[in-house]
Amino acid sequence: MQYPTISEYVKASQDASDNLDMSTEATNAELNEAIMDEFGVKYSKDGRKLLKAPQNLDSTYSIKEGTKIICDMAFADCKSLRSLVVPDGVTSIGKRAFSDCTSLSSLVLPESVGNIIGNPFSGWDGELKCLSPYFIYDNKVLFDKDKSKIIAFRDKKTTSYVIPDYVTSIGNGAFYDCKSLRNIVIPDSVTSIGDSAFEGCTSLTSLVIPDSVTSIGDSAFDGCSSLTDIVLPDSVTSIGDCAFFLCESLISIVIPDSVTSIGDCAFDYCESLRSIVIPDSVTSIGDGAFDSCTSLTDIVLPDSVTSIGDWAFEGCGSLTNIAIPEGVTSIGDSAFSGCESLGSLVIPEGVTSIGDSAFRGCGSLSSLVLPESVGNIIGNPFSGWDGELKCLSPYFIYDNKVLFDKDKSKIIAFRDKKAKSYAIPDSITSIENGAFYDCKSLSSLVLPESVTCIGDYAFYDCKSLSSLVIPDGVTSIGTWAFMGCSSLSSLVIPDSVTRIGDSAFWGCGSLSSLVIHATGAGIVDSVFKGCKSLESLVLSDGVTSIGDSAFDGCSSLSSLVIPDSVTRIGDCAFSGCTSLTDIVIPDGVTSIGTWAFSGCTSLSSLVIPDSVADYVNWAFRGCSSLSNLVIRATGASIVDRAFKGCRSLCWLAIHAKIVIPDGVTSIGDDAFRGCKSLKSLVLPESVTSIGDKAFEGCSSLSSLVIPDSVTSIGNCAFGGCRSLKSLVIPDGVTSVGEDTFSVCSSLTNIAIPDSVTSIGDWAFSDCSSLRSLVIPDSVTRIGHCAFSGCSSLTNIAIPDSVTSIGFYAFSGCCSLSDIIIPDGVTHIEERAFYGCNFSNNLKQELISRFGIEIFW
């Protein structure tokens, strides 16, 4: 039979699908409009693409019929997934689609698959069966149908491999994470090495790249930490981004004259690399190309180089000498930052631009001259460097160790590290990025009314700065502007400020009083993080959001009024505010982020308004004093770990129970885990799912009604609910998962509906008060240790539908003296009835059918 080529196949598929999108990427737009099935798997709204599966996807899953594309990373890290069915009809599978599905035992590629992007199977070692005529699977290696391209090398135990000489291309991620592979032979037929081709091959010690290879992809040898040396042939013209990133043992590499570009981070963290010669063909050194090459002592840059990228040699602490070629016109941000052994450096005439922090921390560099050609300085290139500076450029003024622009309207670098006080001249309108960086002696500073802008990290780590008045004309305070100003005790932010950058006051540990008059600035991410002395705070009306980690670790903050204008409270916004006793969330708030109030150990009461549409994982975790909770939000879900560890949580306002309002559809994983004082709970009819460990450890919970609307109860959902006496599982539930009711030691009876087909491992283990139980005819499997330790169980009927009983299933059921095992049971595992009080006759009967191992 003559099969079409892959390109012909894809074209035909496109024609048949009216040129619909064939991309394996799951776009944000698609994810936002996605349709979620009952297992939490997201599909595109037209059903053609499987976009993303949740990482907690468990047991068995069948991809829906009609699916054409399995997107990149679709099932990545689904570590509990044991079985997956890919239907015939799927045509494309994206990169790393099944990566790290460590419990998945096998997978079948159906005939319809004609397009595979990269290596979908990286980090997965299960059995693969290929039915597609467009690929060949031979000795654990997946090739295209012509065997010209290696797609996936899957023999993770092999220490050496010879690539066949008919292979011309090593695909993206083909040998990804083959940690046992020490030696590999690449034949002369190979012309390209793809992105991440050998990434994570930590045992690979040596490699010869043949003359036929012309390109080395991004991250091709990323993380090959045992690779000591490599020779690149003259045929190679480019070295991709991060190509040798984290090759920690790489001592030497020869770059041929054919190479014209060295990618960003190409040799980043090659900590053993001592010297390197860059050929005349190279014109640019990419961003981070030799970042953190801590053993690099010598490097020769050819005259052909015209630009040195950002962080190009950052952290090269052993580099003693480098000559910047005459042709270089730009030196990037942090280009030589942290080159602490660099004794001398000449900036050639011709350089026109120098980036921020370019020479930061060059402690051995005694002097530096700015040539006449320099007309553009970004931020402060000299932060953290105390050597002698001479300025020849007419575009700048260097006066009394302060570098200004030529008009003296901007302070670029304040370099008098011994100064304790300074009055900024009235002509200054802008304090540039890093201008006063690390001025540890500066305790007093006067800002004139003329200043309108305070740049990023302008006063970073000015540890002695104790007082500062921000003038009314300032409109912008940059990112990290006052970060680490640990002596700053009070501050007023005027209403002229329209922008405050992220982390602007992070680590201002002495800041105890703060007034924010600015209404349009917003409370941005990490802005006051770690301000551990901050006791009070006034926020003006007009603030609309409180950013991620905005007040994280403000351990002295006892009260705060959030203005009505706020609509969003970000992730970790008040995490670790251990003195915060009460807070009012205004009615306009629609979103409360992950960990938002986690660790607020003094918070005793809380009202969640009905405007809240979503509060997410861990939002109130560890609020150990929270005893009063009012949830008015009707459209939200009680999501993963929302109230985990709220051990004082027991009642709502006047009621002696927590009332979850109508409209809530799901109780997430760990939502109320560890709420030891929670006694009773009412779940509304709107709830359809209860997540893993949702009520685990709620040891006082004695009363609960699960509504008929619930179809899914997660693993260990009620584990350790020692006071729970009775429970009815609604008809829609199909399985009782692992540990779902384990250690419910007061549970005397439970009703299992006919809809349940399996009873999971440890499902009712150590339910020591459970006396009798009816297992419905729908159940086919009783899991491992399912009823182990049910010491009061005297009577149980196993239906004809059951075919298997797991090991230790009824071990320790010392009151169980009789049982009837139907003929349909074909397999009982070892010690299933260990410790049961059966008569000798019954034991002999069961031993004759299933072997003595079921008792021992």
What role is predicted for each listed range?
Residues 1-42, 48, 53-69, 78-92, ...:
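Structural signature of tandem-repeat unit edges
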